[in-house]
């Protein structure tokens, strides 16, 4: 498995034309509901086979790159395919299914602390769907108290639930790391968010996007976090930990 540094990770993100945020904010799994079909099409399902169940989520951040977390690239199942723009957990009847040609962990990833829990997938061909925007480097896109949305195909009930067949969304509030440190040990590569008891990420949501919505459509959505620690430990807790996309070192390129 290859790995990449903070600077080169950022270079990949911006060198391939990943969309960046141009700033203005809209106030959307467990405890949520199905999103309208044809929305959040930058959300990707990661699959072992072309038409099998998505076992992780991801975010299309350029036509040929998907951002996800480290647990999604071979620890349980091989990340052989991504399904982009699909509303459904499995099958090939909507969206597009594209083969993964390489997967890279961030070199800063620490399996003990969970720092830099980020991975990048490169696709065999460009996707026709619009990538999600990346956050600004000045911390202006992640503000404690702001509303955010989590989307994924994870369990909708726990512990005896099953994965959602349709893409789900739930609204969460971003917490300061100081407040969240009462529950978890955090660093600057993480962001904490929660929606109260019963509104959370769950099994199957790992790697999926935490979104800041800035308009009535999806074209200005920004991916600020990736489902990380919370979905691997328990479901339905008041707050969960996400990998912080702002911490990837984009500022080193003057973004």
Swiss-Prot record:
GO molecular function, one term: serine-type endopeptidase activity
Subcellular location: Secreted
Cellular-component GO terms for this entry: extracellular region
Presence of keyword Amino-acid biosynthesis: no
Disulfide bonds: 56-72, 180-192, 202-235
Pfam families: Trypsin (PF00089)
Function: Secreted effector that suppresses host plant glucan elicitor-mediated defense responses. Targets host endoglucanases and inhibits the endoglucanase-mediated release of elicitor-active glucan oligosaccharides from P.infestans cell walls.
Quaternary structure and partners: Forms an apoplastic complex with host endoglucanases in tomato leaves during P.infestans infection.
Protein name: Glucanase inhibitor protein 4
Gene that encodes it: GIP4
